[in-house]
Structures are given as structure tokens and as C-alpha cells.
Amino acid sequence: MHPTRSFQGLILTLHNYWAEHGCAILQPYDMEVGAGTFHPATTLRSLGPKPWKAAYVQPSRRPKDGRYGENPNRLQHYYQYQVLIKPSPPNLQDLYLGSLKAIGLDPTLHDVRFVEDDWESPTLGAWGLGWECWCDGMEVSQFTYFQQVCGIECSPVAGELTYGLERLAMYVQGVDNVYDLNFNGLEGDEKVTYGDVFLQAEQEYSRYNFEMANTETLHQHFIDAERECEAILKAGSTGENSLHKCVFPAYDQCIKASHVFNLMDARGVISVTERQSYILRVRNLARQCGEAFLLTDAGGFNFKREGE
């Protein structure tokens, strides 16, 4: 299935490319997240000394970005393609350019530029040295070397690539409206567009995010998720020799708190002062999850580097 003819073909091509370069092709995380970085395969696995290579698609939700389906390229629900390689290989940029060529954007035929743009996620306590990747004047992906995640230094440094799939697909298909994207690669009566799949949901979720979400309920959900995250970590910390700290269930609650915060923000019920307070509360949960992860086997607690 040719990547320039369908949205699903673009995804399949990226899957095949990164699988051939040693990445485990994972599935999307089954929770509401604001970006592919929130997937534990990135947030948690970027920590600790253990090598890690993974790629996956992640549905992402940013409630404030909804436009009731009336904007041709702005969505409250969209898809990111995420690649994380730890330690970051010296040829990561070449691998990225190879992926562009695989999906039909030959770097020798297009103006591909890397524009310095360091990345930060305040709620995750994460930042990295990064670049926006522009093709013929349009941003198509982000290229980051993680320095810190969950407030913890990344050692070794992990390399992350994030592709905005809708924007990339619009470029390779040559369409100006995201809802006109060919989704399945067929034509005529069998053709399915991005709008056929997602337009109604985009309209309805915009109404919910901006007009209908019960703010009192959301506030309580945030408190509940915060308490549950800390309670899980406390319960999982019993026993000094335990390498199972219940990090993943706790991190799920951190993700829930983050999404609820984003919904409250979209509803316009968070002041400037409160906003910073909520961000710090989510960041504190992420930090606790990251610290607990490093005390587990998956986090590299008993891992020995070569030569040690």
C-alpha cells in the first residue's frame, strides 16, 4: 500500500521501516494522552540504563485545539508516530531522513531543514535538545535528544522522533484539508476519507470539551487520580527487595490527572495561578513514578552495562 495514497499506507510504511531498523512495533496506549511521549514506552523506558528501541502510533488528545471540525488542519484528536531509541545512535538523523524517503519525501528532491527548537513537557518534568524538521517550509516532525524525564536525568540519552501523521499525510497526498485525506487508498464508492472516519467525533468532542464537560466532576476526578497514584506507589514500595513497585498502575493515574487537567483548561475554569499549581501537581506524580520505575528490573535496577 503506497504511503502517498492513503493515511493507513503511511502508517504501515513507517512501521515497516522502523521494524527493519530494529524497533519493537508497539500498540497505542489505551488511555487519553496529550502526546505520544506520555506512552510509558517513552516516558518510563527513556529512564535507566537499559537499551530500548520502540515505535508506535499514539492517538493524542488536546481538548483546547478542537475547532468543531471547521478548521482544515487543527484537531482536538489526532495521531502521532513515535520512535524512541536508547541510547541514541550516532546516525539517528540519517535514519530519520531514510524514513522520509520511505514515505515518498526524498531529501535530495525536497528542501529538508532542521530548525532548532528545544522541547519541553512541563507536566512530565521533561525536556530535551531538539529540532523541528521542516520539508519545503512546513513542519513535519520533531527530533529530540531527551536530557530529563520525570525530573530525572536521562543516562544514557535517548533519541526521540515524533511525526505528526495528519500533517505529514496532507503533505504527501497534496491536500489542503485534513478531512479530505484518503484513508484506505481506494477510489470511487470504496474510498474512505479521514472525514468519513473522524469528522463527526471531532464535532461532538469539541462540544463536549468546550461546553458540556462537568467541571465539578472533573475537579473531583483530578483529586481522585492524584490520591490513587500516590496510594498505589506507597503500597507498592513495601519490601526493600521487591522489584515490582506497581509503577505502571500508578502512572496510569498520573496520565488520568494530566488529561483531566487539560479538559478543565479547555472549559476555561483554571486561572493562571491555578494552572501552574496543577502542572506542578502532575509533574510531582510523574517524578514519583519515574523514581519508582528506576527501582524495578525494567528500570535497570540490577542492570549491568558492558565492561562493568
From Swiss-Prot:
Q: Which E.C. number(s) belong to this protein?
A: 6.1.1.14
GO cellular component, alphabetical, reads:
cytosol
Q: Does the keyword Nucleotide-binding apply?
A: yes
Q: Which reaction does it catalyse?
A: tRNA(Gly) + glycine + ATP = glycyl-tRNA(Gly) + AMP + diphosphate
UniProt-listed GO biological process terms:
glycyl-tRNA aminoacylation
Taxonomic superkingdom: Bacteria
Question: Which controlled-vocabulary keywords does the entry list?
Answer: Aminoacyl-tRNA synthetase, ATP-binding, Cytoplasm, Ligase, Nucleotide-binding, Protein biosynthesis
Q: Which GO terms describe its molecular function?
A: ATP binding; glycine-tRNA ligase activity
Subcellular location(s): the record lists:
Cytoplasm
InterPro entries reported for this sequence: aa-tRNA-synth_II/BPL/LPL, Gly-tRNA-synth_heterodimer, Gly-tRNA_ligase_asu
Q: Name one Pfam family in it.
A: tRNA-synt_2e
Which HAMAP family does UniProt cross-reference here? Gly_tRNA_synth_alpha
Give the protein family.
Belongs to the class-II aminoacyl-tRNA synthetase family.
Q: How does it assemble?
A: Tetramer of two alpha and two beta subunits.
User: What is this protein's record name?
Assistant: Glycine--tRNA ligase alpha subunit
Q: Provide the species name.
A: Brucella canis (strain ATCC 23365 / NCTC 10854 / RM-666)
The organism's taxonomic lineage, starting at the top: Bacteria, Pseudomonadati, Pseudomonadota, Alphaproteobacteria, Hyphomicrobiales
